[in-house]
Curated annotation (Swiss-Prot):
Family annotation (InterPro entries): Fe_traffick_prot_YggX (IPR007457), Fe_traffick_prot_YggX_sf (IPR036766)
UniProt KW Transferase keyword: no
Membrane-spanning parts: none
Name of the protein described by the UniProt record: Probable Fe(2+)-trafficking protein
Keyword Protein biosynthesis applies: no
GO cellular component, one term: cytosol
Lineage: Bacteria, Pseudomonadati, Pseudomonadota, Gammaproteobacteria, Pasteurellales
Species this chain originates from: Glaesserella parasuis serovar 5 (strain SH0165)
GO terms, biological process: cellular response to oxidative stress
Protein family (similarity comment): Belongs to the Fe(2+)-trafficking protein family.
Protein keywords: Iron
Amino acid sequence: MARNVFCAYLKQEAEGLDFQLYPGELGKRIFDSISKQAWAEWIKKQTMLVNEKKLNMMNPEHRQLLETEMVNFLFEGKEVHIEGYVPVESK
């Protein structure tokens, strides 16, 4: 049976994650208040960030940057800025 959470990103009730995907207290916070849909949106942004900024996940500074962007995106409603990226307009 799916578990529902009040998603901090979507600001509505939605299907929650199946298990904790990120370690520590932040991981618990994500598990308790981020939906599958919001997490999928973050993964898209994360992939773009890693590729465009050429981030190396072995570098602690790059991991910290990604974590900061994740918190800003999921909990503070801040859009991820990727230089040169222009979203395709929906028709």
